[in-house]
Amino acid sequence: MTRSLKIGSLFLSGVFLTTALTACSGGQTGPATLTVDLSDRHQTMEGFGASSAWWSQEIGGWTDIGQSGKEVREEIMDLLYSEEGLGMNIYRYNLGAGTGTGEKPGVFTDSWRSAQSFIDDNGNIDYSLDANAVWCMNRAVALGADKVFFFSNSAPDTMTITGMPHSEEQRKKVTNLAPENYQAFADYALDAVEHFRAQGIPVIAISPINEPQWTWQGGQEGCHYEPDEMVALYKVFYQEMLSRGMTDDVELDMFESGQFGGSKFKKWFKALAEDETLGPVLHTLSGHSYNSSFADKEKTAKWLKKNYPDLKIRCTEWTEMTSGRDLGMDSAVIMADMICNDLKILDAISWTYWLAVSQYDWRDGLLYVDPSEPKPQTYTLTKRYYGYGNFTRFVKEGAVRVGTQMDRDKELNSIAFEQDGKLTMILVNSSAENERQVSFNIANANYQTMTTWLTDETHDLEQTAQTAYSAQGSVTLPPQSIMTVVLE
C-alpha cells in the first residue's frame, strides 16, 4: 500500500519476523533452482543512484514543516539517500542551460524541463543560482552520497546557435553549439566542477553530452551532435582538463548514449573509441536503457567485450516510458527485471534511475508529487520506490557480482552479489498469478543465517523471515514480487 503524506514516516514500513515465508493464495507453477557460483566473479559495483533533473529545482525549495517536524525537502531527501531510506550513494547533478533569473528562452513542455545555469542576467557566473537543486545535492552528500556526476543536456543558452537550450523544428539533425563556443562551454562546465569540489562535493565525473543521437528540437533541454562534432568537443574538454590537472581526480565520461545497440550506438561510440587522442583516455561508457531490447544489449555487450575488454559501463538513466501513473507492482517488477538484466548482460558497475520525483502521468518517479499549481507540498511513495530499495539498501559500493544460473523461466529473474562475507541475492517474480518456490544451490557455502526482505502487493520492503540457513534452503515468491535474500 502506498502512502500520500505531508511528511510521512521515514522508516520503510513495519518490520516483522517470522520463521518462514507465508504462502500466498493464487496459482503456483513448478519450483525453480537458483545456482550461485561464488568463484565466477564479475564487476565490482560503484553503487546506485538517481538523477536530479526536473525535480530538484523545485523540491529543494519545499520548506513547509511536516508531521515529523522536518521540512518536506529534508524528508524527501532522507527517503532517497539516508540509510533508513534507500541509502543511494550516487547523485547525478544536472548542470542546467537556462541563464538568468527570469523566464528561460525556449519551448518547454512544462517548467520542470528548463534548468537554471550559473550564469546571471548580466552574463556573470553566480554560484548562488540554481539554489534549490544545489541544496538537494548538498543534502544528498551530507546523507552519504559519495559519488556526484555532473551532466549537461545542453550548453548554456547564451552559447547556443538558437539562443535556446535546444534546436528548432527546421533544424533537424543539426547541432546547436557552434565550434567557436566549445572552449566557453568547457570552461563553464569545468569551472563549476572545480567550484563544487572545493566546497566538498565529491564530483568524480563530468558528462558534457547527453543522448547526442536525437534531434532535440524543443520540449526540453538537449543538443544534437554528429559524431565528428562530438569528438571535437570532447577534445576541447580533455585538453582543458589536462591543463587544469584534473584528469587524476575527475573522469571525462564518454557520451551518454541514448541506447545500447543499433547503428545509432556504434556510429557515435566508435567515433570516440577509435580516436587517437580520446580512445586511450575514455575508460567508461554511460548509456540509457530506454530504447534497447534484451537482444540489443546482449549483442552490444558481446561486441564491446570482444573489441574493448577494458571498457566499463554505467547505466545512468532508465524509466519505463509508459503513460499513466502506477503506484503498484506492475511497474515495480518491470524495473527490477531491467536492473537485473542491465547488471548481468552489460556488467554495469552502477545503475541510476531517471526521475527520483515525478509530477507526470507516467510510470516514472520513485515518488509522485501533485502537478497542480501551486503545488501542495505532499508526495506519494510507489512500489517502485520500495522495489528499488531491494537493490540499493543491500548492494553497496564494493559488492562483487557473482555468477548465477536459474532454470529458463520467463517469469523469474535473479542476480547475486558477494561482499564482506555476505551473499545477497535479489529475486524477481513477474507473474501476476503464480507464486514461485526457488531453492538454492550454492557450492562451498558456509552461511549460518538467511534473512529475507519482500516487496509485493502487501509488503513494502519488509523483513519477512530470519532463519538458520541450510544447504537445501528455499524461499517462496508471491505473485509480482521482489525479494532480497541475505546469507551470512
Q: What are the language-model segments listed below?
A:
Residues M1-F11:
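Bacterial N-terminal signal peptides that target proteins for export
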Residues P31-I204, H224-V231, K235, Q239:
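N-terminal catalytic cores of secreted or lumenal carbohydrate-active enzymes
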Residues K312-R393, V402-K410:
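Aromatic/acidic polysaccharide-binding cleft in carbohydrate-active enzymes
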Residues D407-N446, Q480:
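Carbohydrate-binding surface patches
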